[in-house]
Amino acid sequence: MAARRSLRYSGDPGAKRSRNTLGSTNSRKQKAGQKPKRKDVFDFPNTSDVSSMLRELEEEEPYETFDPPLHSTAIYTDDELYKHCVSSTSPATHRGKESRNLNPSENEASGNDSIKLSAKKPRRKLEPISDESDSSEDNVRRSVSIERPRARKPPAAPAAASSSSSPSERPAEQVTPRKTSFPQPSAVEETPAAQSQLKTQKKVRPSPGRRKRPRRGSTHSDASESMHILCLEGKRQSDVMELDVVLSAFERTFLDYKQRVESESCNQAISKFYFKIKGELIRMLKEVQMLKALKRKNTKIISNMEKKRQRLIDVQDELIRLEPQLKQLQTKYDDLKKRKSALKNSKHFLSNLKQLYQDYSNVREEEPKEKEKYDSSSLPALLFKARSILGAEKHLKTINYHLGKLLKQD
């Protein structure tokens, strides 16, 4: 892991040369007294051809730095580290290395300057790595080196924080790579398949500007992550109010500002202020929505009242128009009612008269010799019988009058 972290640094090629020189000088000073000297991974073998190596590197993008993805599964073997180091260096870097080999005094001067710069930077102590962790890491590296590079998932916050530490904070003893059982390949033995694999790894890795920065710890970190920013896209344009826009902008501003503040007490005060203002805005939004709902209901009621009033006016006009017809129908009804009563009375009279005549016929059949006697009760019958007599008398008078006129003319 130390070898992988030693390659993750940003800056210009000059800064990389100074840090590499610092690591090499520190390793030489610390291991001067040791008899068995380790073979440096970054030293080129004598059998390699520099011109062919430069031609291969010119095909790559110049001044391209290798930066592995920020997650715990990105473990590389020393072979892959060596290939990444060779591919990430430019021809100008190789020429700088050759010039350093020719001028050792300049190398020592640059090494002293880099040592002074690194001494000014704060360092933190690292926990020693046990042999068991070394063996497990070697096994993991062997298994990972066989597999094809796959698309990496975004890193978690703890892994990003642990892997994003710069090499300037590490001691010089942790920068030196460990030996493995694999032989050290040269730059000439690098095959096109390895180059294509390296290109795919470079394409997969995210750009440094797009990496997620870990949030600073605070008491309200969980609350800030679970806060819901209002989405105005789902609402209609007529439903969006000024308070919705204000609340959305206020939440975004709070999240951006809280990330920039480092003090925990300030974060707590900002969070309290934010929650109070947010509560007030939400309460105002609810009241405005209730007011809008009441206004809608009031508008509906008023429209219904207007419709009913208009209907009432129409009915009144229709009643006024139909009132004469009602009077005519009333008179017709009264007339028909009178005729109905008269018909009932005449029907009753005829039925009684028929019954009387039937009784008279029965009496005459029983006693035909008996004389008829008339009293007051039989007056209607006498009048009915005298109608023919009175008619004959009137007829005779008319004949007598006409005869008198004829006699006077003669």
UniProtKB/Swiss-Prot annotation:
Expressed at high levels in glioblastoma cell lines. Up-regulated in GBM (glioblastoma multiforme) tumors. Significantly increased in both the tumor core as well as the contralateral striatum and cortex in gliomas. The modification Phosphothreonine is found at residues 73, 191. Pfam families: CENP-U (PF13097). The keyword Chloroplast does not apply. Component of the CENPA-NAC (nucleosome-associated) complex, a complex that plays a central role in assembly of kinetochore proteins, mitotic progression and chromosome segregation. The CENPA-NAC complex recruits the CENPA-CAD (nucleosome distal) complex and may be involved in incorporation of newly synthesized CENPA into centromeres. Plays an important role in the correct PLK1 localization to the mitotic kinetochores. A scaffold protein responsible for the initial recruitment and maintenance of the kinetochore PLK1 population until its degradation. Involved in transcriptional repression. PANTHER family: CENTROMERE PROTEIN U. This is Centromere protein U. It comes from Rattus norvegicus (Rat).
